[in-house]
Each structure stands twice: as structure tokens, then as C-alpha cells.
Amino acid sequence: MRETLTAAITAVIESAMADGRVRLEAVPQVSVERPRDPSHGDWATNIALVAAKPAGMAPRDLAAIVAAGLVERLGADAEAVEIAGPGFINIRLARGVLADVVGRVRSERERYGAGPRTGRRVQVEFVSANPVGPMHVGHGRWAALGDSIARILAHAGDEVQREFYVNDAGVQMDIFAASVSARYLELTGRPFEFPEDGYRGAYITDIAREILDAEGERWADATAADREAHFKEQAYAAVLGHLKRVLHGMGVDFDVWFSERTLHAPGDAGAATAIERGIDRLRSAGHVFEREGALWFRSTGFGDDKDRVLTKADGTYTYFAADVAYHADKYDRGFDLVIDIWGADHHGYVKRMESAVAALGHPGKLEVIIGQMVNLFRNGEVVRMSKRTGEMVTFEDLLDEVGADAARYFFLRRSTDQPLDFDIGLAKQRSSDNPVFYVQYAHARICSILRKAAGAETTDESVDVDAVAARITADPAALALLGAEPGTLAGDAELGLLRKLAEFPEVVSVAARQRTPHKITSYAEDLAAAFHQFYTHCQVVVDDAQLRNARLALADASRIVLAGALGLLGVTAPQRM
């Protein structure tokens, strides 16, 4: 409808320009938005305010021309076109247009709100936790965020790949191996020296014990170098497997697990490594120089505040050099847009990476989202330690306590650029105070209504709700009964629910464009509220067959859209609660 109204407004102004009523060189960009106050109508535009000055007209005079033209063009589709304030134009759609959304939803089903195929290939890289220990709750937030953004972009028409960058090269892996080695020696009763900056979590001892149980004490008498080289691979595999299991338990599965080691590995027949090739690309484009024995990237040429080291004076590569190579590889794989989701501690890294991508020939094709941290609360108190382990609360601890649905939903309720206060007690409540329960309960309630309408017991597990819904037929004459009594509680509740269903495609479009899954959670809660209002004021199963079918169809459309919204968040839509 936004596109229809935009085209209509443009055509009205062009017609007025052609006959001399409006003097403009070109039609300004037309903006059509949902009013914040539903009483102002279904859509609004400020085009008269935008175009009045270049047209040399008073805004309300121009608004009058546009409004009159819209009334003529929209005809019976518009209930009212009104001028408000200094020159805003509010548009209220006819009930028939609103009621049409029910048929559209029930026809398109899970494709409702989906965009056309864009042909754009998008990679979303997220979580990318070091494989040296369990994930913290911040990783959980970024997992929910990245996966939901991927789902929303795919629904909007993009081809999306999810990728996890495994930081399995570098000194942290050596420290990790030395830590496991020390705990292994401790378990065998041998003398050991724990690394000063080693990893001290109980999970290190757990990994060492797994190795001891599987392979015995044969590594106790090996050289430290041999033991640590072996343990590095064993411990790495154990942690990586654990990360995959925890993420899968939250419904997050990656298409690619990209190993940093591959960037350091030489190519076939001793060919250059990916890092060397990445640096060579920058060098051939004239963006590399030497200073003080080191090799530098001239990132100041792309807006960075200082140049960045690629190769240190001792010949070793910086982490930045590996990141340059990694991003070069991403674009070599044909992605049109790369979205990286990083923790707040990487904020200062953004500009240098954007500079490198531009220097590689892909300006504007990298988008970095900074995910803020999560603060856990229980009974109003900050939670820092796990009751089970006495150590930091991990992402897995939280999942075990509140479940995947609640964790995902709560992680996504707030804008990414804001720290998140996660109330554990609230996430576990089975009441309307818990937003995810509130939304899921609305879906389950609709399923119960549909089962009851089919004459089945609401607890009958054998009833296929989709099959029941498919037998509900509501022709245009029946749907025209919805909202037929505006100004009454029932009529207003029906209209409110219809309007909310009609908003979903635009909500998805905005969430995809802005990378804002929290707009989907807000919408889901509003839709659930609109349905609960409808259910309170409208008896669904009534004697009048036409009205009954119309209201059942409206309930079914609400079920479909609630499930669709929850699906974009990676949250289940239960049929019973």
C-alpha cells in the first residue's frame, strides 16, 4: 500500500504541474509513513510541507490540491483524506481494503511480508568467539541478533549466508594448550607449572580429564612441546564442538565455520598465503609503505585517524593483517554486502576495517554492527556468578535456566546499540508480564479457538490446526462484516486488528533495511495485544455463519502473522501452552 500511495501522490503532483496549478521543476521524494497516533488514519505524508517552498505556495494550499487528487485517484479505497496541522495529509483506508488483508495473509501464509528476490548476496558474520572457552551471555545476544538479521534479510529477498570466524591461530591458542597441559599434569599427580596468563576456568580441568580418560597418562612423560601440540588440537576440537552444540540448542546454525588458520597456510606448491596475497593487493594499489622496519597500511587515506601496521618489524603479522585477508576472501566469494557483528570492545576497530575494505576495492560494502553487553538481573540484583559453578555465568547457563525461546526474545527486545538488562525471573514467568509468553500465548489461544470451532476438544493432540484453518472459508461479503460497526468495542477491535495485520510487510521491510530485529518484537507484542483486545470484545464462534467465518478467518490470519513474526526472531509458535 505504501508503494500504491507513493505512486498516487507522485501522479497527482505531476498532473498539477502539467496544468500549471503547481510550479515545480521535479516532484520531490515522496514520504508515506504510518502515523504515530492511529486516530490520525492509516497513512500520512508531509509532501505538502516539503514541496511548498520550492513551489512558492502555502503548505495547506498545496495539501488541498494533493488531497483532492488523492480522493479522486483512490476512489472507494479511501474512507477519508484529511489535511491536518500546517499541511500534513492523513489517509484513512476503506474497511474493504483493510479486510482484504485477511485473504492475502491466508493465501500467502509464511510468505506474507516477504520481499521479491533481490539477487543480492549477503554474508552475516557473528559470534566468532575464541575457541578457548565457553561463550559469555554477550555472545548469546549477538547470536540471536545475527541469526535474526539473517532471517529478516532472507525474508526481505536477499540470499544470506551465516558465518562464524574461528580465531584458531595466534598466541591465545598456545596459552590455551599450556593451560590444559598443566591441569592434565595436575590430575596425574605430576609436577606442573600453570601459565601466568593461563585460562583458569573449571572447564580447563574438565577438558584435561576427558583427555586423561581417553588416552591415559601417556602424555605425562612427553616433552612439553609435544604434549601441548597434541592437547591444542584435542582441546580446540572439544571447545569448538561445545560452541556448536550450545548455538544449535538456541536454534543458531552456521553455513560456514571459517578457520583463521587457513589464512596463514601456504597455497598449493608453496604459493603465497592468504595474508600475503591480501597485503599484496593493498601494495599493488599503492596503499602500503614501510616505516621503522614495519609494513604499514595507509588507512588515513580512507578517513582513519592513523595508519595501521600490517607486518611488525620482527616479520610477524598483526591481527589486522589477518582481518584484511579474511575480508578479501569474503568478497572473492562474491558477496555484495558483508555484515560483521562485533562486541563493544571492538568499536575502535571499525574505521580501520572499513578503510581496508575500501582499499581492496569494495567501498560501502562492509557494515559493522556493534553489539552492547548484557547485564543479568535476578530479583532486582545483578547476577555475576553461576550458582552451579561459582564462576562467571555463561551463555549455556542462561539457556539452561530460561530456555532458548525466552533467551532469544529477550536478547532481541532492545536496540543493539543499547546495553541490555536481562531479568531472569521475568523471562521464566508464565504470565502476561513476560513478553515472550504474552506473544506465544496469543498464538496458542488462536489455535485453541480454531480447534473449538472444528468441534474438537482444545486439548486434543491429534487435531491439525492448519487443516482446521483450511476449512474456514470467508468470501468478500463475509469479510466486509469486519469492522462494520466502527465506534463500538467490537467494531474498533476488529479494525484495530486488521490495521495491525496490514502493517507487517512494512515492519519487515524497515527491520531489514535498518537491521533492527527489535522492531519485530515490538510489532509482535502490539499484534498480540490487538488480538487479545479483539478476543475480549468479539465473540468469535457465533450463530451467524458469515460473521463466524469472517472472525475465524481474521483469527487465523493473526495466527499466521504471529507465527511469521516469531519465526523471524527464531522463536517457536506453540499451538498449546
Question: Predicted segments — roles?
Answer:
Residues 1-99, 106-110, 114-577:
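Non-catalytic interaction-recognition regions
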